[in-house]
Every structure is written in C-alpha cells, then in structure tokens.
Swiss-Prot record:
PANTHER family: CARBOXY-S-ADENOSYL-L-METHIONINE SYNTHASE, TRANS-ACONITATE 2-METHYLTRANSFERASE-RELATED. The lineage of its organism: Bacteria, Pseudomonadati, Pseudomonadota, Gammaproteobacteria, Enterobacterales. S-adenosyl-L-methionine binds at Y39, G64, C65, S66, D89, N90, D117, I118, N132, R199. Disulfide bonds: none annotated. GO terms for biological process: tRNA wobble uridine modification. Its EC number is 2.1.3.-. InterPro entries: CmoA, Methyltransf_25, SAM-dependent_MTases_sf. This is Carboxy-S-adenosyl-L-methionine synthase. Pfam families: Methyltransf_25. HAMAP family: Cx_SAM_synthase. The keyword S-adenosyl-L-methionine applies. It comes from the Bacteria. Catalyzes the conversion of S-adenosyl-L-methionine (SAM) to carboxy-S-adenosyl-L-methionine (Cx-SAM).
C-alpha cells in the first residue's frame, strides 16, 4: 500500500542531502506521481518500446529500478522465450520493496533483483536497457563511462531508454518550464514549504543536463540514432538505438 508523501510538510531544522532511504521508499509511488509530470505515460509507453525491441534469448536491464515500475512494464510486454530482466538499485529500502512488487505479479519472464551499484554491473547480451530518472544522480564525470558500457553491452538493434529531468540552454525557456513544473506540484497538493525543502535537499545530488548534452554523450558512446520521444515541461525521455549492423 502506498502512503501519501508528507515528508517535508513541517519545517526541517537541518536539511541534508537527498537519500533514497526507508522514509522515501515508503511514499515513493505517491511522491513520483505528484512530482514528475508524465511519469505514468513514460512507464506505460516503456512497455510498448519493450514489445518492439526485446528479442528472444536476450536480457533487459533496469538500471536504478527503484520499486520496479519500469521492470513490471517491460515484463508485461515480453512475449519471447528465454528472456530475463535484471533490475538493479543501490537503495536497500527500494530493493526490498521492489522484490515484493515483482513477486506479487506472476509472469513467465524471470527477474533478478540486485542490490548494487549500476556502475559495477556488467551489461551483456542486452536488447533493451532502461535508465529511468537515474543518470541525473551520478556525478557528471561518471555518466559517459556508463553510457559507453551500455552501448557495448547492447546487441545490434538494441535500445536504451533514458528518462531525465532536463536543464535548458535557453534560459527563458528553462525558467518557464521550471515554473510550470512547480505549478504542477502545487496543483498536486504540495505546499511552498514542501517544494522548497525538497528542492534544497536535491540540489547537490541531482545535477541535470540539457537534451543536447545527453545527445552528445549518446553519440560519443556510439549510438547512431537518438531522439526525444516524450517530454512534459522539464522532464522527458530519449530513446537511443544501436545500429542493426553494428559490430
């Protein structure tokens, strides 16, 4: 059962950096629905991408799986034999709940739920990789290496789904979408105090990039094609494709 997010409804004397701890994990479904515009659309459409890209006898990786929403979405639309999903997160609280969620929905495709660092996981025989609001929590200097590893581990014709909060090179557009995102949170019942305190905790650990920066990294990693397939305000998702004739 999901609980309502009231973590920041009262003043907090000392705001530390954001962590995905037990308190966050408990309210995460409510928090992300009320904080990330378009989240449900991205999750549901990831299953459509899975239907197009997952191949028999291959693996799917959900890197930074949190409670397993993307994993479950992918698994619903795998209709091939001998596939496996590998879901990884470094938060013990998230992984504990993720295992429960995965176990609650029976399906023929097995899921390995792993507590670990996505930077240390080998990517092998992958037809699809999902980074759903995960890359933004890595140090910027570590992002290219992860994308390089994903590209190398993808089979020819494979796809990476990369969902992120974006910054914008056009400051005027960035300000507009930033303010619209805050309007979205207010409309979903968050107070000014809640919005401010959460932002203060996130500002040192969630460092956003522009769509142009993401595309440049993907190209450098080797992806021949990448494009934004979904956006709502300053949140969105790109799909990057490895060529079918790639070595």
């Amino acid at each position: 059962m999901s609980h309502r997010d009231t973590l920041f409804s009262a003043p907090i004397a000392r705001l530390g950096d954001w962590t995905f701890d037990e308190r966050v994990a408990e309210v995460f479904p409510d928090m992300i629905q009320r904080s990330v515009p378009g989240y449900s659309n991205i999750i549901s459409m990831i299953s459509m991408l899975a239907e197009r890209f997952v191949q028999p006898g291959t693996q799917v990786y959900d890197l930074g799986c949190s409670l397993g929403a993307a994993t479950l979405s992918v698994r619903r639309n795998i209709h091939h034999d001998n596939c496996k999903i590998i879901a990884i997160d470094n938060s013990p609280a998230m992984i504990e709940r993720c295992r429960r969620h995965i176990d609650a929905y029976k399906a023929p495709t097995p899921v390995d739920v792993i507590e670990g660092d996505i930077r240390d996981i080998a990517i092998e025989n992958a037809s699809m990789v999902v980074l759903n609001f995960t890359l933004q929590f890595l140090e910027p200097s570590e992002r290219q290496a992860l994308l390089d590893k994903i590209y190398q581990g993808l089979n020819p014709g494979g796809a990476l789904v990369l969902s992120e909060k974006f910054s914008f090179e056009d400051a005027k557009v960035g300000e507009l979408l930033f303010n619209m995102h805050h309007d979205f949170k207010r409309a979903n019942g968050y107070s000014e105090l809640e919005i401010s305190q959460k932002r203060s905790m996130l500002e040192n650990v969630m460092l956003t990039d522009s769509v142009e920066t993401h595309k440049a990294r993907l190209h450098k990693a080797g992806f021949e094609h990448s494009e934004l397939w979904f956006q709502c305000f300053n949140f969105g998702s790109l799909v990057a494709l490895k060529a079918e004739d790639a070595a």
